[in-house]
Amino acid sequence: MSNYPKPINRLIEALSYLPGIGPKTAERLAFHIVSMDETKVNHLITALQDSRDKVFECSTCNNLTDKDPCTICQDESRDSNLICVVQDARDVTAIEKVQDFQGKYHVLQGVISPMEGIGPDDLNLKALMDRIQGEGITELVVATDPTVEGEATAMYLNKLVKPLGVRVTRLAYGLPMGGDLEYADEMTLQQAFEGRKEL
């Protein structure tokens, strides 16, 4: 690897396990950590350990939590008949930042992707079906990414859930705020026209 002391080499290697962290960035981070005062290093160590040891999936929705069920599932002010289906826990956080959705969530932990060998059985669909049948869900908002895999997952969910009398909706997508039409691709423009609404 390099002529650095073994502990630094191990730290660089460990940091490079993180997504988006290449060898150079891992090296910079390692040297930054080595130069940090002991209190901050201990805080970092504790935060890493706690995140790994004390965070788990909610038994109801599969969102990441440190209590079971999670605070969203426990919140009685939320509409229990409305579930937003997302790919992973980061999507829950993104939607919650908007502070507009007042239903509950279900985290699929992925999307259907035959190219990656991920089929419906690899997703958290059984738990979703159990919730739909046991909790009286009336609407499912599918909030998977607008990709081929996200669309395939949305279509599969629609076929699976619609026969149960549950309304299945999809998040609208199209042009971003502040975007220029001239830079939009054809698919985005098509979806923007399909999702248009009356003013």
Swiss-Prot record:
A zinc finger (C4-type) spans 58-73. Keywords: DNA damage, DNA recombination, DNA repair, Metal-binding, Zinc, Zinc-finger. The keyword DNA damage applies. CDD domains: H3TH_StructSpec-5'-nucleases, TOPRIM_recR. GO terms for molecular function: DNA binding; zinc ion binding. Pfam families: RecR_C, RecR_HhH, RecR_ZnF, Toprim_4. SMART domains: TOPRIM. InterPro entries: DNA_Rcmb_RecR (IPR000093), Rcmb_RecR (IPR023627), Rcmb_RecR_Znf (IPR015967), TOPRIM_dom (IPR006171), TOPRIM_RecR (IPR034137). It comes from the Bacteria. May play a role in DNA repair. It seems to be involved in an RecBC-independent recombinational process of DNA repair. It may act with RecF and RecO. PANTHER family: RECOMBINATION PROTEIN RECR (PTHR30446:SF0). Belongs to the RecR family. HAMAP family: RecR (MF_00017). NCBIfam families: recR (TIGR00615). This is Recombination protein RecR. It comes from Natranaerobius thermophilus (strain ATCC BAA-1301 / DSM 18059 / JW/NM-WN-LF). The gene is recR.
